[in-house]
A protein has these predicted regions:
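Basic- and hydrophobic-enriched, low-structure N-terminal and domain-boundary segments
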Residues: 1-57, 64-76, 80-81, 86-125
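Short, intrinsically disordered, charge-balanced linker/junction segments flanking boundaries
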Residues: 120, 128-135
Length: 135
């Protein structure tokens, strides 16, 4: 049996991610290029120890998604180990720079963005390089 819903498509999507308790906030739902800041996608922190897959074409936000997850896990006190061959995530060690684009994005998505640095330890798979050698 199907029922008609007066909720917007973004709200219908967000309803599937409506969780209580500690959760990671992945952000606002975007439908056809329109952001609904009241429709938030969340993952319960207790389920983050399970397997997951983040897939997509180049430029679709996979690395940014991993960064957001790592930042929120760090904030929650959960240690994170990430392999970053291309060096895309090394910026986690420094607070981001606020600018008009980040301010507008935070407004559009309903986020309260504050530049934050996170604890980072760099490891290296050899004896050369900047990181602590692993072997």
């Amino acid at each position: 049996m199907t029922t008609e819903s007066s909720a917007s498509p973004a709200q219908q999507i967000a309803a599937g991610y409506n969780v209580t308790g500690q959760a990671l906030n992945l952000g606002a739902v975007v439908v056809d290029g329109t952001v609904d800041p009241t429709a938030q996608v969340k993952i319960p922190l207790a389920t983050i120890n399970r397997h997951g897959l983040i897939a997509g074409a180049t430029g679709t936000g996979k690395t940014k998604t991993l960064q957001v997850i790592a930042e929120q896990l760090s904030t929650a006190g959960v240690p994170v180990v990430m392999a970053d061959v291309k060096g895309d995530l090394s910026g986690l060690a420094q607070p981001g720079a606020a600018n008009d684009k980040t301010a507008q994005r935070a407004t559009d998505t309903g986020d309260e963005w504050t530049p934050t640095a996170f604890p980072v330890e760099f490891l290296s798979l050899g004896t050369t390089g900047r990181g602590v050698p692993v072997r």
